[in-house]
A protein has these predicted regions:
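Conserved short beta-strand edge segments in small beta-sheet-based binding/regulatory domains
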Residues: 32-33, 63-75
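Short proline/glycine- and acidic-rich turn/helix-capping motifs at secondary-structure junctions
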Residues: 38-42, 70-80
Length: 80
């Protein structure tokens, strides 16, 4: 259900809409989905080709964004 190629992240919950808008503006990168919006956990449905660029973009934003592994994200969301 949760692909290893997707980019998982944690950011301040109030910034989830901002992240979604930025990714939407880059049509080819992927689609943002909240894993647990109250905790600021989300992921971008990427391909192997766009995952690296998506990580770089998220880390370049003027807000704190932590890139997580799939396992870390699911554990933080209580979905192990």
């Amino acid at each position: 259900m949760f692909d290893e190629d997707w980019v998982y992240f944690q950011a301040p919950p109030a910034e989830m809409t901002f992240i979604n808008r930025i990714i939407e503006g880059c049509d080819y990168l992927g689609v943002v989905t909240a894993l647990d919006g109250r905790k600021g956990l989300g992921f971008v449905r990427t391909t192997k080709d766009t995952a690296g660029e998506t990580k770089e973009l998220l880390q370049s934003l003027p807000i704190p964004v932590r890139i997580l592994s799939r396992q870390e994200a699911l554990a933080a969301a209580g979905q192990q």
